[in-house]
Amino acid sequence: MAKKSNTKNNPFISLNSYKDNNKSIFYSREKQVEDALSIIQSSSFLAITGDVASGKSSFINAGLIPRIKNGFNGINGNQWSIVNFRPGISPIENLCHALSSDGNLYISDKSKTTDYNDYLTTIREKNSIGLVEIYRNCEIFSKKNFLIVIDQLEDLYNFPDLFDYNESDDEDLLFDLVSKTLKFKDLGIYFIISIDTGNYKKLSSYDDLSKILSSSQFILHPLNYNDLKEIIKKTFNAKNIQFDSEVMDQFNVLVNETDNSLNPNFQLFFKKLYDICLSDLNQQNGYVNSEKIDQIGDVDEIISVELENFYSSLDEKGKLILEKFFRSFINFDKKNIGYYYQEYSYIKNYTDIDDEYL
């Protein structure tokens, strides 16, 4: 088995997305959160766009949602009910699952077993005003603001073998629900959507939705050099760990000369560096120079290096299973280059391991 770092006091969460419970360690996005909230307040709608791995989901879950829950004023006061879902390949069904989970539309927080079917029937019958009907007939109507988060809308376009948006009416209905609901400005229903930059232009083909996109778009850029300095200040410097100017210069060059987002790379890099530095602090050596950086490796290569180290740490059986696991994702379909899925059952059969191990 691979060694695990001591994460007890580590403010970095590696390659994971930030969640609501990580809000206290979600640094350097405070101004962007307030800027995005001003759009929500004026439009009741926010479209977050950005490059792949720029941190859109983290921005929503650890930035916007905690701030909204903490007394952000809407039409119905400062109390909110929030549902958050990905459209996947069944956008309407997934919306109804989100609506019927966790009692979001009840004061008591207890939903009924019939809610999913009831909501699905209402939307299928009422079409674009289905959400309005559901909200008007629920317990939180006029008592709480209702926020619907549709994260990673690119799901609708990235898996053509499973969901063909040119043939299906469901994504049209989803966007009709959004645009029609927003016309009822006094209800207190709000929307946040996120989509990668490469697919954002597809939204312009939905007439009613396209009319509100230009005033509601928020571009989330990857972390820049000033963001990195702010993160370092609130984490490393707070523990009296200082960085050599040469190291900072290297970071500056890296983020300015790299086209793709390095957010995940820096998250993993800082997590490993923080563990090393805390260990060194016990030896009165809280200083980060090039020598210490070399212990971890280059930021832009750290994910591949970490995977190689993990592979090396496995026994022969583990290595064979990991090789089979990655082989199961080999894709010869030109339509799915860039985004590819594989069914769990296929992976299980190909690797020949049980559910618990997988």
Regions found by a protein language model. Give the residues of each.
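Amphipathic helix/helix-loop-helix segment enriched in hydrophobic residues with interspersed Lys/Arg
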Residues: 1-358
